[in-house]
């Protein structure tokens, strides 16, 4: 089945939770998990994962719940404590056959051990970022300044990939250990907050490319990935900026985003939420920068630091952008199934040894969205079977060459920037 320019889904409730003509409490918030409807009216505000749970109200949240809480016994205990009732006798979710096959496929993967962590792989990943930091510092020490900064810029991105997997708890399988790895990698390696990232990134996973839900679409004033987002801009200065966004995105916008996160957004979140472990990581990172500035000149060190951040930001943000930003969006009042979000609003980049390493297996973005808690190095093993599942149910399995996907990303930036002009012609 070929891809489409747009998709239409049922508006929530996407599953008929009640018997027809049964009186309902209009302010009650329910969602379905398994064969029960759970009343989350009073739980939404105290949900440990934040308001992401509100995105599932009125829908069958079985797959979302399972994939977000693969390793959390605490979540199951909380779920059992909530008021619930059996779903009515005639209940059937949207795309029931697809959901049933996906859940059966998931059970097969669990039986095969695909969700089990690999400690040797974790050791390799940690050793890699340590070795690359040492190599970058050694290059600079021996006078190869630009080569050393380039190495450190790339490993900054590698820390981003590693913390991403830690934030999904798919490294060691122990939530506390994975969070510790994420805090260290993201704080020391990138100067950012793992707690902030987890809160925001899970919203993206819950509803990728859904307007007013996916935080990855909430990118103004620096960039707009969709015409509907760009249409919000009224300022002539911002319109002028967006008109050049395809040219500015890689060299300038990514740097501004990184600096905004490092110097304002993430430290503010750490202070507000009292994540002192993350603040300690920042203290070590910027203590080292201060030491270097005191001994080698503030201007020189600042210039090197900005180049280092720019290279790392360009590496990671451009690679994140290829997976979704040029694909169709979901309307705010519609809701796709978990599998449809992965199929219709996500693209893979063609596998190869270098692309698998360069994107740290996130070129298998479809598999990652289906199974965010699966160790990412196992995605190549399941990809052919995911494709078969999609083909059986008439879904498009979108795979593009890396450079094709990158070209589509920048073409979309340009099209969005000039959409108002084209409409006037």
From Swiss-Prot:
The reaction(s) this protein catalyses: an (8Z,11Z,14Z)-icosatrienoyl-containing glycerolipid + 2 Fe(II)-[cytochrome b5] + O2 + 2 H(+) = (5Z,8Z,11Z,14Z)-eicosatetraenoyl-containing glycerolipid + 2 Fe(III)-[cytochrome b5] + 2 H2O; an (8Z,11Z,14Z,17Z)-eicosatetraenoyl-containing glycerolipid + 2 Fe(II)-[cytochrome b5] + O2 + 2 H(+) = a (5Z,8Z,11Z,14Z,17Z)-eicosapentaenoyl-containing glycerolipid + 2 Fe(III)-[cytochrome b5] + 2 H2O
Cofactor(s) named in the record: Fe(2+)
Keyword set, alphabetical order: Electron transport, Fatty acid biosynthesis, Fatty acid metabolism, Heme, Iron, Lipid biosynthesis, Lipid metabolism, Membrane, Metal-binding, Oxidoreductase, Transmembrane, Transmembrane helix, Transport
Gene3D superfamilies: Cytochrome b5-like heme/steroid binding domain (3.10.120.10)
Residues spanned by motif Histidine box-3: 365-369
Domain Cytochrome b5 heme-binding: 18-93
Motif (Histidine box-1): 164-168
Residues reported in the UniProt entry to bind heme: 47, 69
InterPro entries: Cyt_B5-like_heme/steroid-bd, Cyt_B5-like_heme/steroid_sf, Cyt_B5_heme-BS, FA_desaturase_dom, Fatty_acid_desaturase
Annotated Gene Ontology cellular component terms: membrane
Listed transmembrane segments: 134-154, 175-197, 241-261, 297-317
Region listing for Disordered, in residue ranges: 1-25
One BP annotation, GO: long-chain fatty acid biosynthetic process
Principal cellular location given in the protein's record: membrane
SUPFAM superfamilies reported for this sequence: Cytochrome b5-like heme/steroid binding domain (SSF55856)
Chain's role: Fatty acid desaturase that introduces a cis double bond at the 5-position in 20-carbon polyunsaturated fatty acids incorporated in a glycerolipid that contain a Delta(8) double bond.
Protein name: Acyl-lipid (8-3)-desaturase
Organism: Rebecca salina
């Amino acid at each position: 089945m070929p891809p489409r320019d747009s998709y239409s889904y049922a508006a929530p409730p996407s599953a008929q939770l009640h018997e027809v003509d049964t009186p309902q409490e209009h302010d009650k918030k329910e969602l379905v998990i398994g064969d029960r409807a759970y009343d989350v009216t009073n739980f939404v505000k105290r949900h440990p994962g934040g308001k992401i749970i509100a995105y599932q109200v009125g829908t069958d949240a079985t797959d979302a719940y399972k994939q977000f809480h693969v390793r959390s016994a605490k979540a199951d205990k909380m779920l059992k404590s909530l008021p619930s009732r059996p779903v009515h006798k005639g209940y059937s979710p949207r795309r029931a056959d697809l959901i049933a096959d996906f859940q059966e496929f998931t059970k097969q993967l669990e039986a095969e051990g695909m969700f089990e962590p690999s400690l040797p792989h974790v050791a390799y990943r940690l050793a890699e970022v340590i070795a690359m930091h040492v190599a970058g510092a050694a290059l600079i020490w021996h006078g190869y300044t630009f080569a050393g900064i380039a190495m450190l810029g790339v490993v900054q991105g590698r820390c981003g990939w590693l913390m991403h997997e830690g934030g999904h708890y798919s490294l060691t399988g122990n939530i506390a250990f994975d969070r510790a790895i994420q805090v260290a990698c993201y704080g020391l390696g990138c100067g950012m907050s793992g707690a902030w990232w987890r809160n925001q990134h899970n919203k993206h996973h819950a509803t990728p490319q859904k307007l007013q839900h996916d935080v990855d679409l909430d990118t103004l004033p620096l960039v707009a990935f969709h015409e509907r987002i760009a249409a919000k801009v009224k300022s002539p200065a911002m319109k002028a900026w967006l008109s050049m966004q395809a040219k500015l995105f890689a060299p300038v916008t990514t740097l501004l985003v990184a600096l905004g996160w490092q110097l304002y957004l993430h430290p503010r979140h750490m202070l507000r939420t009292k994540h002192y472990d993350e603040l300690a990581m920042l203290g070590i990172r910027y203590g080292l920068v201060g030491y270097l500035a005191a001994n080698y000149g503030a201007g020189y060190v600042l210039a090197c630091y900005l180049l280092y951040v720019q290279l790392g930001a360009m590496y990671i943000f451009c690679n994140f952008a290829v997976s979704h930003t040029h694909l169709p969006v979901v309307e705010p009042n519609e809701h796709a199934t978990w599998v449809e979000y992965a199929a219709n609003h996500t693209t893979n980049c063609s596998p190869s040894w270098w692309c698998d390493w360069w994107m740290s297996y996130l070129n298998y973005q479809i598999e990652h969205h289906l199974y965010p808690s699966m160790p990412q190095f196992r995605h190549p093993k399941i990809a052919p079977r995911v494709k078969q599942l999609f083909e059986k149910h008439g879904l498009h399995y979108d795979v593009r060459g890396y450079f094709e996907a990158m070209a589509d990303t920048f073409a979309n930036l340009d099209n969005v920037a000039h959409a108002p002009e084209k409409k006037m012609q």
